[in-house]
Amino acid sequence: MGLSDGEWQLVLNAWGKVETDIGGHGQEVLIRLFKGHPETLEKFDKFKHLKSEDEMKASEDLKKHGTTVLTALGNILKKKGQHEAELAPLAQSHATKHKIPVKYLEFISEAIIQVLESKHPGDFGADAQGAMSKALELFRNDIAAKYKELGFQG
């Protein structure tokens, strides 16, 4: 399920847009995740108290965590599928410490695509969306394989 060179280029072009305001994009991704799937908020002790979208938008901690999430994902995407070194510690922490199910990674993938679609409609058409979906699916499949190695049934 690899991506072609052209698809990777579409992914990296879109990611370049994210990096122009990684904190803003990250915050919006997390807000969409928490609003669309409130159960995911339970995995974040630091953010459980944030009940409204306004509270989430005002949270510097949420913005910082969004930056952390998208920076890590960007480092993985830039490896164009050759991301074993970057993925292993992420899978380890998400399986053993945070206990994040793969389903939640599907939810955040949807949120990432929605944010890119809304913030960059002219630069994130059907081809770019399809390529990003494939890249995020590759990431999730590889995380799921690592989870299995670690004995986490997430």
UniProtKB/Swiss-Prot annotation:
Binding-site positions, O2: 65
EC category: oxidoreductase
SS bond partners: none
Sequence positions that bind heme b: 94
Positions of transmembrane segments: none
Binding site for nitrite: 65
Chemical reaction(s) catalysed: Fe(III)-heme b-[protein] + nitric oxide + H2O = Fe(II)-heme b-[protein] + nitrite + 2 H(+); H2O2 + AH2 = A + 2 H2O
One of the Pfam families matching this protein, by short name: Globin
Positions carrying Phosphothreonine: 68
Family named by the database record: Belongs to the globin family.
Protein name: Myoglobin
Species in which this protein is naturally found: Ctenodactylus gundi (Northern gundi)
Upper classification of the organism: Eukaryota, Metazoa, Chordata, Craniata, Vertebrata
Protein encoded by which gene: MB
